[in-house]
Each structure stands twice: as structure tokens, then as C-alpha cells.
Amino acid sequence: VFHVSLAEHIQATLSESDRRLHDKGFCGHSSLRGVSSAMLNSWNQIIVNLLREIYTNIERYADKSEYSVIVTFSNNAVDIVQVNKCRQKSRRCVTLGVRKGLSIYSRLISGQGGFIRYEKDGEEWSFYCMLPLLT
């Protein structure tokens, strides 16, 4: 049984992940917008785990220039928007992450009515996800 609000857990994950990336020389920011009374449960934990996957991918494939992660609560859903530039050496920015972690999350999330979209345009990686909040 979880007794932590989802918003508190997400904010802690964003702050911790920003600190970790900043310590490794990355520039960027994360923010949480909106309000939710949802509590952390096994489904909502997937949101937190997906955020950790996103930060791992930033660390692996992103240029150390500006990154952005924005999490927004809205109408029984959570939206995640993430952008960064890919490292010059990591031209495979899209293919590496998609085959493993993101594809697993995409299947889980689409099974509950959400979706993940991502693309690489030139050197810019963009990611968008909508996850329903389940109680």
C-alpha cells in the first residue's frame, strides 16, 4: 500500500534526476505543472519509472546542452514532454532507446489508453507521452 502522493513522488524524481544530470555537466531543467490528488499506486509507479527511463536516455544519448522535461497533470491524465539535442557521436539517438525501454513503456501505456510519440528532427529529439491516471 502506497501512502505518498503521485505529485510529491514525481517532483522528487524530477529534482533528483536534475541534480544527477547537472553533476555530470548537463544543462537543463524539469518542471511539474498542474495539480493532482492521485496517490502513488502500482500503475502510477509506471509514470515514475518512465521518467527515470527518460533521464537515463538523456544521459546516454543527449548533448550536454539544454534539455527540458515538463510533466503536466490535466483531466485524469499526465502529459510528459521532453526535448534535447542528440550528441554528435550518437546519431542513433532514436533507434537505441526505442528498441528497449521506450518500446516496453509504449506497449504498457497504450494498453491503458495512453500513448508515446517521439521523433528526431535533425539533431533534436522530442518525446511526448499521455498516460491516464488510474486510481
Task: Write out the residue ranges for each language-model feature.
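ATP phosphate-binding glycine-rich loop and adjacent ATP-lid/helix-beta elements
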Residues: 92-122
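Short C-terminal beta-strand
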Residues: 123-134
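Conserved short strand/loop->alpha-helix "switch" segment adjacent to the catalytic nucleotide/phosphoryl-transfer site
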Residues: 24-52
